[in-house]
Amino acid sequence: TANPVIRNIIGQPKSTFNIRQIMDEGKILVVNLSKGLIGEDNAGILGSFLVTKIQLAAMSRSDIPDIKDRRPFYLYVDEFQNFATDSFATILSEARKYGLNLTVANQYISQMEETVRDAVFGNVGTVISFRVSADDSPILAKQFEPQFEPNDLLQMHNRNFIINMVINGEKAPAF
């Protein structure tokens, strides 16, 4: 690659950090995948690569027999659509049992492939929505029924949101 940042990252014979160790020891890993810094294609490739490495590290925690002994690890993904692959759909469906907790942010539902979208809505415990487009409101309104309708999502004021949560395994009313 012509980008020196990318070349320095992927051109190393050995990684300087261990994602499994970061998970197990409760450390923090922050990765800046700014498109302005490394370019859109490079950000997507590195992000997908990193997500796969995190998935593999999380799944390797199966060597800790008791789920309660798996230290929780939190993965936050902004601009989720850039990394939303079928592999990510697998992470969404299996993450909890490996102690991997996910928070993803996305601007438009249509930016996700259908399989990923189904995995997101089938596996999330909390959905937060600000004002959305006419295309997204019918899809998201299903998450907030019966308290809210599609039109409610279209007409929200700035800095207001609707939230739906699962509390102690039970779906709480949206508010």
What are these regions (language model features)?
Residues 1-100, 116, 153-157, 161-172:
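P-loop NTPase motor domains
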Residues 91-173:
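Conserved ATP-driven motor cores of ASCE-family P-loop NTPases powering translocation/secretion/packaging/pilus
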